[in-house]
Design a protein with these regions (language model features):
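Conserved AAA+ ATPase "sensor/coupling" helix adjacent to the nucleotide-binding pocket
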Residues: 407-413
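Preference for solvent-exposed, low-hydrophobicity sequence contexts
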Residues: 405-406, 423-427
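Short regulatory helix/loop adjacent to the ATP-binding pocket of P-loop NTPases
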Residues: 143-146, 372-386
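Conserved H-loop
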Residues: 135, 367-371
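P-loop NTPase motor domains
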Residues: 48-56, 95-98, 105-110, 114-361, ...
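Conserved AAA+ ATPase "SRH/arginine-finger" region at the nucleotide-binding site
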Residues: 390-398
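Basic- and hydrophobic-enriched, low-structure N-terminal and domain-boundary segments
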Residues: 1-110, 114-115, 119, 421-422, ...
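Conserved AAA+ ATPase core "coupling" helix
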Residues: 162, 400-407
Length: 507
């Protein structure tokens, strides 16, 4: 349709020009007619003079589309926003869509950390609560307030003592805490992890009931004789694991228990049920809108050792929010960059699918989809990613991830009007086809700090550029205890890993 309109328009312009050049008083209406006909025929014979060699009229029929940054900004301003909305690359996200969660996908160095910084700044300005699994302590350095916020790390001087026993209020909590520490397995490990959860749950319950501490917990999970552990688990679901003839199975199960429990060996041995409680902190923070933040920073060299512990603590924080009173007008942000590298966080799925009425807002970062599939399985990882309402797609050099992101942005149905001409005459044809709005190869070549923003709701996807924000670095992200003891822990971690791989569990 556009093609024919332009054809007619050019012919009219030609008519005016032709008649003016010849002199309107002399030719009158005939001059206009002659100019129109000549221009019409010239366009028909040589259309490339007007539209170029690839003469085609493209029109979007339906499906996805990507608009310019200025267009997306104009459309966003028409939406209703709170006084200080979360903005992604200068595009305001409607308040009602914040608890549909955020996902930032891109290779290292593309701008994900900047996005976390900018969302966190809005959360702090508004007085929202937050839970942060903090790689390299970047958000801790900018936002931690000593005396108000809480920093959890077994190696940091500012951290309170913590124990999983402090997360239990009744016998019903043993299974939940055990599942936070030993997440459900995928594939062949599913049943084995379940058996390991039975043993951990039984030990947690008995130690909690007897008023024990982390030292007791670690002793039974890692160093006690099988006979002592059997006596402790007597009467629980785990007791069947200790039956005669099940020695080989028990050895395998205890290896799993030990591999997860060794991170508890880094905790204060004297911490117990009266120590700092993540559950109480998060519930009070949510229900009273205290605006306090919980930081769990980790240095890169400590990540393999502490990531299972932090994953368990994040899971416990999620469970706490989900048991708080409903209030979809409050906001409690969960910042988990590179969420697929922490191991499996069991509570991520309920956070994304159930926390909206609690005011929970997940802000997740991801490098490539293979990491998510490895830890959560193909189908469940798809559920997790599709549960995020606001996506920002940055450069992704991984081919599988670029393909996944291209499909996620979507396809569009288009109509092409193609015009061709030759000495024999000219012809016009129409073609209807479906194509990707953006190709994987285009996503692989995006510059740093540029990408495609897709917000749930009526707004189309749009091109955006992230304005760099200089981090403030108000405090040191790590104020470590005796460095020599930390090095000792790191050496022990490596040695324990070798023993588990070569010898299995040794009671």
């Amino acid at each position: 349709m556009l093609y024919y309109f332009l054809w007619f328009l050019y012919s009219c312009i030609g008519a005016v020009f032709f008649n003016t050049a010849l002199g309107q008083p002399k030719f009158g209406a005939f001059g206009y007619l002659l100019g129109f006909v000549c221009t019409f025929l010239l366009h028909h014979k040589f259309p490339s003079l007007f539209f170029g060699d690839n003469n085609a009229d493209f029109s979007h029929i339906r499906g996805a589309k990507i608009v310019s940054n200025s267009k997306l900004l104009a459309l966003s301003k028409k939406e209703k926003h709170v006084e200080n909305p979360v903005t992604i690359a200068n595009i305001a996200v409607p308040f009602a869509l914040e608890n549909r969660h955020f996902l930032f996908v891109g290779s290292p160095g593309t701008g994900k950390s900047q996005l976390f910084l900018q969302v966190a700044k809005v959360a702090r300005q508004r007085g929202n609560g937050a839970v942060i699994a903090d790689l390299d302590g970047e958000l801790t350095a900018d936002f931690y307030r000593e005396g108000l916020d809480v920093l959890l790390s077994p190696f940091d001087k500012r951290s309170p003592a913590w124990s999983p026993l402090a997360e239990m209020e009744g016998v019903w909590d043993a299974d939940r805490v055990a599942k936070s520490i030993i997440a459900d397995g995928e594939g062949s490990s599913k049943e084995w992890n379940k058996y390991a959860q039975f043993i951990l749950s039984a030990v947690l319950l008995k130690i909690w009931q007897s008023g024990g501490n982390n030292g007791d917990l670690v002793h039974y999970l890692m160093f006690s004789k099988n006979e002592d552990l059997k006596a402790l688990c007597d009467g629980s679901e785990a007791s069947r694991m200790f039956e005669d003839g099940a020695e080989r199975m028990l050895s395998s199960i205890l290896s799993i228990v030990s591999s997860f429990a060794k991170t508890l060996n880094k905790l204060d041995k004297n911490a117990n049920a009266d120590s700092f409680s993540i559950t109480k902190f998060v519930k009070e923070n949510a229900e009273k809108n205290t605006g306090k933040w919980l930081f769990m920073p980790v240095r890169d060299d400590m990540f393999p050792m502490l990531s299972p512990l932090i994953a368990a603590q994040v899971d416990i924080a999620i469970s706490a929010l989900l048991t708080s009173k409903n209030d979809d007008q409050r906001r409690v942000f969960f910042f988990v960059d590179e969420f697929a590298t922490w191991g499996k966080i069991e509570g991520i799925e309920p956070l994304l699918t159930k926390a909206r009425k609690k005011g929970g807002c997940a802000v997740l970062g991801l490098q490539n989809v293979s990491q998510a599939r490895e830890n959560y399985g193909k189908e469940r990882s798809q559920t997790l990613l599709s549960s995020c309402g606001t996506w920002l797609t940055l450069r992704s050099t991984d081919g599988d991830t670029a393909e996944f992101l291209s499909r996620n942005i979507g396809d569009e149905d288009i109509r092409r009007v193609i015009n061709s001409s030759s000495d024999q005459g000219s012809s016009t044809s129409e073609q209807f086809s479906k194509q990707r709005v953006i190709l994987p190869s285009e996503l692989q070549k995006l510059p740093d700090l540029e990408g495609v923003l897709n917000i749930a709701g009526p707004l189309p996807a749009g091109w955006v550029s992230i304005k760099y924000m200089q981090p403030e670095r108000n405090v040191e992200p790590f104020d470590l205890k005796d460095e020599r003891s930390i090095e000792k822990f790191l050496d022990e971690e490596e040695q324990e890993s070798v023993e588990i791989e070569t010898d299995g569990f040794i009671p």
